[in-house]
Amino acid sequence: MQLVRQKEKFATKRRGTVCAVLAVLMAGAAASGCAAGEDGRAGGSREPVAGRPGAAAQKDAAAAEARRLKREQAARVAAARKWGLAKMPLAAPAPPAVKPRITTREGFEVEGGETLPPVFTTVPTKERIVFLTMDDGAEKDPELLRMMTELKIPYSAFLSDYVVSDDYGYFKDMQARGVTLNNHTLNHRYLPGLSKEEQRREICGEQDKLEKYFGKRPTLFRPPYGNYNGDTLRVARSCGIKAVPLWAAEAFPDHMEWREWDQDLHPGDIILTHFRGEEDWEGSMADMIRRVMKTVTDKGYAVARLEDYV
């Protein structure tokens, strides 16, 4: 409280009154414990100090969080060991509050493509992250679902109905585990060799199938073999496609293949692989994941979820 000095001619006659008022105020403040609070705000809210209930609650909460993080870390170490990973996968950073602006990669343009879905192989980011995508759906390995769930590795699926239709349940299980199911056409045909209407049946027909069996029309589309033309992108846009992610690298159980001359990963690169097994590969899908994660982790990258950025 600041005491304002009175003018001299009123000072004498009011001094006694002022003193009396001050005495009452000071006594009231002492009795009430200064209800306004030591920080000067109404209500007396302030940071708890040691020995008071608020401080104990904060300490307990911090300890509980530390225990939770320790359990999570132990579970990740155990999962990496269980699935034969030499190193524990690195954790991806939190997704951006605003998704980056995606544009078509230079050299991948089509005439009049300014308003068409962008075609790209890398997501613009400075984070050391990459994205794992799997195409077609031919191999339906239950071990893959368990492995990816326990390792907490995000991935995206691009499905073709002609190899998915014999077991929609497998992909419903995958979707329930947080995987986004995207469009890879009905029959995996070479799109530039088809008429516009034939392409429409392939692309929009797959949109209809995915909505019917999985409850959602995708916004991401990958053309078979990575081949497309202007009609492909115009048709895709007409049935709800917003972006066309291709790939910067392809993963196999025994090696990696690279698009770029330096044969390396870069921030935001998209990795392609397929739903395949030992009939087609020298190894299983689990072997392929081990290869991917060794490459990614050794190079200091984490796997992030594509749909958080696109």
Residue ranges and their predicted role:
Residues 1-39:
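Secretory targeting and sorting signals
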Residues 90-183, 187-190, 209:
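Active-site beta->alpha N-cap acidic-glycine motif
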